[in-house]
């Protein structure tokens, strides 16, 4: 989460979900945000302002006419200070006020004055949420560029079940970060492959590699955060699907070949970060192979070359990025792969470099481009490298 140096004005309104805003405040603060909490008077009936003051380190403001603040007109100073303005939970009442420009408390008055992006997280009874008036008000806010985080479904405090629950904190954090992030990939379709493949020897054993999928998942997550429509074709991993990403699970290289090639034509960027097995057992035993006294010899067959097939079928305007993991002759091998596979860009890294490779949160990479130039950034997090890769692809797409 990227909140360091950002001022988040968090508005808490009067619903039972107000208590969940305490965890949101804590997580924002832990991730480096300056959190300024505004509350409606009804919100203060559900949870004490002191809770938010303790968690944020700042005074929580309830009364528009509180005379204990410094000389600035507080709702104006907070409106100007905000990098993002968040209403969570947002009741039907405050949504209606926001849609119609009513400013009769600290929350709605400051909202009317801010020029920051606004995030609204509705939380209310299902009937109130589904009411056409509420839905019309939400559409009005969407039309004005507000970021609406849809409520979750489940058991509600009133005893009903349905839509209306305030989403979990991680979903709220993602929505807030997205509002803070430039949507420069909006309208782009991006396909990312990630993780290992598994090639079955028998019903128990398989051939695979050490890939965890972290790099590909980082790329998919950052692309979605920046507004792209993202498809992630993933081999078996223990990673959670990044929010906003459509994940397609596969197991073998042939599965990945089919999943990728069937979707390739619609993509603007294809980023093939998966560690795909080059070979598979020529035959897969129907029963578990039993241990004998001698050696076990397994004949291997070549898997289809997904990157090469994408390079052949690449349509005009489509950009193809491959990856190369090497243990020797890194740049020579990477340059050869870039040319042979008709890539526009290739990300090369060495398993020998400390801080690079499988299972690390960082990477050390050289970016090679079809026009011959290279870029060698210093060690960075995989999320930062993901953004760099996307930046370069976006730059090429605009030429």
Give the residues covered by each predicted segment.
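A cross-family phosphate/adenosyl-ligand binding-site feature
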Residues: 1-120, 125-399
